[in-house]
Regions:
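Small/polar-residue-rich loop-to-helix segments that shape phosphate-bearing ligand pockets
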Residues: 23-104, 169
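Short, well-ordered alpha-helices that flank and scaffold nucleotide-derived cofactor binding pockets
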Residues: 7, 11, 99, 126-130
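Active-site/ligand-binding loops adjacent to catalytic centers
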Residues: 132-169
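Active-site-proximal loop->helix
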Residues: 3-51, 147-157
C-alpha cells in the first residue's frame, strides 16, 4: 500500500511522507534497503521508519501538524488504506463477484479473504450487504487477533454502508 501511495504521489507531483512501522523482524541490509523501501525512495517519498511498539498514529499526527505549520496540506491515509474511502473499491469488488455468480446461476454462502488492516474485508462486507446478498465474508487475519480486528472491520463496513445510504449492521 505504501509503495503504491508513493508511486501515485510521484506521478502527480505530490510530496509523500510515509510513516512505517518495523513489523517484520528482519534487519539485513538486503531487506531494509531494497525492494519496496528502494522503490519508495526512488519515487521521492520521505520515509519515517519507526521501531516496533512505537505509536505510529501519534507520530503521524505530529508530522501532520508540522507539515501544516510549514504551509503544506497533508492528507492522512491510514495503515493499509483502511478507511471508509479506502474500502469503497471493495464494494465494487463485491458487485463484480455477485455479477459473476449471477451470470453462472450460482450463489455464495461464504466469501473468504485475508484481513490485514481490515479495509478489504470491510468493503466486501458492505458491498454484499448493500446488494442484499446473504453471503458471509470470512476474514482470515494475517496480522491481528480477531478480537482486535473485528471491531475495526465492523466500524469501517458500517461507515461504508452509511455513505452508500444504507443502515449499518
Amino acid at each position: 500500500h505504501a509503495r503504491l501511495t508513493a508511486a501515485v504521489a510521484a506521478r502527480h507531483g505530490l510530496g509523500c511522507e510515509l510513516v512505517l512501522s518495523k513489523l517484520v523482524p528482519r534487519t539485513t541490509e538486503n531487506y531494509t534497503e531494497n525492494g519496496n523501501v528502494l522503490l519508495m525512495r526512488n519515487f521521492g517519498a520521505k520515509l519515517h521508519i519507526l521501531e516496533p511498539g512505537s505509536d505510529s498514529k501519534a507520530y503521524a499526527r505530529q508530522l501532520m501538524r508540522e507539515l501544516r505549520m510549514a504551509r503544506r496540506k497533508p492528507y492522512f491515509i491510514p495503515f493499509g488504506g483502511s478507511s471508509v474511502m479506502g474500502a469503497l473499491g471493495y464494494v465494487e469488488c463485491a458487485r463484480e463477484i455477485n455479477s459473476q455468480l449471477a451470470a453462472q446461476d450460482l450463489r455464495a454462502d461464504q466469501v473468504f479473504c485475508t484481513t490485514g488492516s481490515g479495509g478489504t474485508q470491510a468493503g466486501l462486507v458492505a458491498g454484499f450487504a448493500a446488494a442484499g446478498s446473504t453471503a458471509r465474508v470470512q476474514g482470515i487475519s494475517v496480522l491481528f487477533p480477531q478480537e482486535r480486528i473485528a471491531p475495526v472491520v465492523a466500524g469501517i463496513a458500517n461507515g461504508v454502508l452509511m455513505m452508500l445510504g444504507h443502515s449499518p449492521q
